[in-house]
């Protein structure tokens, strides 16, 4: 017997892209009562005075009309500024490299938007993220990696709570990106051939360095090797991240070998950028980290130890770790030394296909000694 979904209202976060368009289409085809909502999170008028959000909203309207669903626009610019952008700036100010997408999902898409959807009578919200939701026999929701390994977005969803996941659907989780495009083209959706957006949501195609300098004045300083050799001037610590290769302007200067130069450390108090040669420079390697803002996707004890795998950046294979959790903090010990563990980035825990949750990296250690990364 077919399930009658018509009494279940799903509010879809629609960005004007192909993924969220197909999300709305699939739910409509499955018989749900679907409403589309466009979130305006940033005043993003480009240098020609064209507001790109207006163009995206037109695409949302076109797709919603095509599939026959009502649609609305909601303005979250204030919430986004207060909860995501201020955090983003504060992290850069403190010498860290934040991941605003993780915070945007936690605070906007699955908090501000979820709350708004409830005022529309939603039973669930849905987005075009590549992740899967599975309910067990006890009604507990588990978040699994998206089937398309190259598109899996659980890393960015790792701060979601059980309460948030209970109200969430990810209709694209079992599909490959190529299948999603094919569905859009077959249905003749207005967004079928639209290219994927890249970069941080509020910077879009803008030059990151220029963008950041509008909000944080850059302080130039010295670029040094770990053993104290002066390598010239850096443009401002906020422009560099641990393990970065390009943009140092010292490619022609050699040490004792011809290996490329990398950012291997920062000293915020002295405004010094440390550089070293070699991808696996010893200063880039660490054996453990401290993390805070620890969030698990289901209820867990206040203190426990967990053996699992982890990712320390988005496109990276899993590594075996032991996690010692105490309330909202954790010490993560690596089975093998790891390269360029970056304060401000997310550490995300996995058990096979399941994403267990994660936290924000505060400090990396090498054999118990803090690494000079901030």
From Swiss-Prot:
Its main location: cytoplasm. The keyword ATP-binding applies. Disulfide bonds join 104-201. Residues 151-153, 313-314 are annotated as: Interaction with tRNA. It catalyses: S-sulfanyl-L-cysteinyl-[protein] + uridine(34) in tRNA + AH2 + ATP = 2-thiouridine(34) in tRNA + L-cysteinyl-[protein] + A + AMP + diphosphate + H(+). Pfam families: tRNA_Me_trans, tRNA_Me_trans_C, tRNA_Me_trans_M. Gene3D superfamilies: Adenine nucleotide alpha hydrolases-like domains, HUPs, Translation factors. Its EC number is 2.8.1.13. The record marks 129, 345 as: Interaction with tRNA. The keyword Transmembrane does not apply. GO terms for biological process: tRNA wobble position uridine thiolation. InterPro entries: MnmA-like, MnmA-like_C, MnmA-like_central, MnmA-like_central_sf, Rossmann-like_a/b/a_fold. It comes from the Bacteria. ATP binds at residues 13-20, 39, 128. It is found in: Cytoplasm. GO terms for molecular function: ATP binding; tRNA binding; tRNA-uridine 2-sulfurtransferase activity. The active site is at 104 (nucleophile), 201 (cysteine persulfide intermediate). It is an enzyme of class 2 (transferase). Residues 99-101 are annotated as: Interaction with target base in tRNA. Keywords: ATP-binding, Cytoplasm, Disulfide bond, Nucleotide-binding, RNA-binding, Transferase, tRNA processing, tRNA-binding. Belongs to the MnmA/TRMU family. Catalyzes the 2-thiolation of uridine at the wobble position (U34) of tRNA, leading to the formation of s(2)U34. PANTHER family: MITOCHONDRIAL TRNA-SPECIFIC 2-THIOURIDYLASE 1, TRNA 5-METHYLAMINOMETHYL-2-THIOURIDYLATE -METHYLTRANSFERASE. This is tRNA-specific 2-thiouridylase MnmA. It comes from Streptococcus equi subsp. equi (strain 4047).
């Amino acid at each position: 017997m077919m399930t009658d979904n018509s009494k279940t209202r799903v509010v879809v976060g629609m960005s004007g892209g192909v993924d969220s368009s197909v999300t709305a289409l699939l739910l409509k085809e499955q018989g749900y009562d679907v409403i589309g909502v466009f979130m305006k999170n940033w005043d993003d008028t480009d240098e020609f005075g064209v507001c790109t959000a207006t163009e995206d909203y037109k695409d949302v309207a076109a797709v919603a009309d095509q599939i026959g669903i009502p649609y609305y626009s909601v303005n979250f610019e204030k919430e986004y500024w207060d909860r995501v952008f201020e955090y983003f700036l504060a992290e850069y100010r403190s010498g860290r490299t934040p991941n605003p997408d993780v915070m945007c999902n936690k605070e906007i898409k699955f908090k501000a938007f979820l709350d708004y959807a409830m005022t529309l009578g939603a039973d669930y919200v849905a987005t075009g993220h590549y992740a899967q939701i599975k309910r067990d026999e006890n009604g507990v929701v588990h978040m699994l990696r998206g089937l398309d390994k190259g598109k899996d977005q659980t890393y960015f969803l790792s701060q979601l709570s059980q309460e948030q996941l209970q109200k969430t659907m990810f209709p694209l989780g079992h599909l490959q990106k190529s299948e999603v495009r094919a569905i859009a083209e077959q249905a003749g959706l207005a967004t079928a051939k639209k290219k994927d957006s890249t970069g941080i949501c509020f910077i879009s195609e803008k030059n990151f360095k220029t963008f950041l300098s509008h909000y944080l004045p850059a302080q130039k300083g010295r670029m040094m090797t770990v053993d104290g050799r002066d390598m010239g001037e850096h443009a401002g610590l906020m422009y560099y991240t641990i393990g970065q290769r390009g943009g140092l302007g010292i490619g022609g200067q050699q040490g004792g070998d011809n290996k490329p130069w990398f950012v291997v450390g920062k000293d915020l108090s002295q405004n010094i950028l440390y550089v070293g040669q070699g991808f696996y420079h010893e200063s880039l390697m660490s054996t453990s980290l401290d993390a805070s803002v620890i969030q698990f996707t289901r209820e867990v004890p206040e203190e426990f130890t967990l053996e699992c795998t982890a990712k320390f950046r988005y496109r990276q294979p899993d590594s075996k770790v032991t996690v010692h959790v105490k309330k909202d903090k954790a010490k993560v010990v690596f089975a093998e030394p790891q390269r360029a563990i970056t304060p401000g980035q997310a550490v995300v825990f996995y058990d096979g296909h399941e994403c267990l949750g994660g936290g924000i990296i505060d400090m990396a250690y090498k054999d118990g000694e803090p690494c000079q990364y901030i």
